[in-house]
Design a protein with these regions (language model features):
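Short, Lys/Arg-enriched, disordered terminal segments
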Residues: 1-3
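ABC family nucleotide-binding domain
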Residues: 5-210
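H-loop (His-switch) and adjacent beta-strand-loop-beta switch element
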Residues: 210-220
Length: 220
């Protein structure tokens, strides 16, 4: 068995569509090491988002296993999975999903509030990591698209996750701003593993490694 932070073995996922079971992932074997920045690429329907949902514990596989830092997350209860996900994984999406009425600081601090942590010093630290501490009192409408995505990244960092999952994080940004966001993600890998879904080959080449999916399998 690999000592990788993320270890998938024989990973399968199928969905019930009418009377039929449609398999989306067909026995994925994959290792991602601690401190890696990995891009997952593939055509629409190749299984990229399904794979990320399984790694991020937003869904369960129908076969195989996933180990995160040696813990088999496919065998734990749903309640345990929610708690493990909250402590282990941060998410960044194409859309920023910031609350318009809250400041940058308040948006970043939200996960801490839900976790019952009222200290919030971690929110300031996260904003500093994305170089936005000078904009902490600004609301989303007062920030550029790139700044809003930085706030979203800071929010994903605030619980100190082991894994950062980014699903098309530059899709709503122009080329230059997108490259700056990827450079920022690359700078985070000293403290965590970064896994990104992207259709952009140029941005994917900025990561350490590319995993190509085709028809629910890893393309060698």
């Amino acid at each position: 068995m690999s000592n990788g932070l993320i270890h998938a073995s024989g990973l399968k996922k199928s969905y019930k569509i009418g009377p039929n079971d449609v398999e989306v992932l067909h026995g994925i074997d994959m290792d991602i090491e601690n401190g890696e920045f990995v891009s997952i690429m593939g055509q629409s329907g190749s299984g990229k988002t399904t794979l990320m949902n399984l790694i991020g514990m937003l869904d369960r596989p129908t076969g195989g296993s996933i180990l995160i830092d040696g813990d088999d997350i496919t065998t734990i209860s749903r309640k345990e999975m929610v708690d493990y996900r909250r402590r282990t994984v941060g998410f960044v999406f194409q859309q920023f999903h910031l609350i318009p009425s809250l400041t940058a600081y308040e948006n970043v601090a939200l996960p801490l509030v839900f976790a019952g942590d009222k200290g919030h010093s971690a929110a300031l630290d996260a904003l500093e990591r994305v170089e936005l501490s000078h904009r902490l009192d600004h609301k989303p409408s007062e920030l550029s698209g790139g700044e809003q995505q930085r706030v979203a990244i800071a929010r994903a960092l605030v619980m100190s996750p082991k894994i950062l999952l980014a699903d098309e994080p530059t899709g709503a940004l122009d080329k230059e701003t997108g490259e700056r966001i990827i450079s920022l993600l690359n700078s985070l890998k000293d403290d965590m593993t970064v896994v990104m879904i992207t259709h952009n080959h140029d941005l994917a080449r900025m990561s350490d490694r590319i995993i190509n999916l085709q028809d629910g399998k890893i393309k060698e």
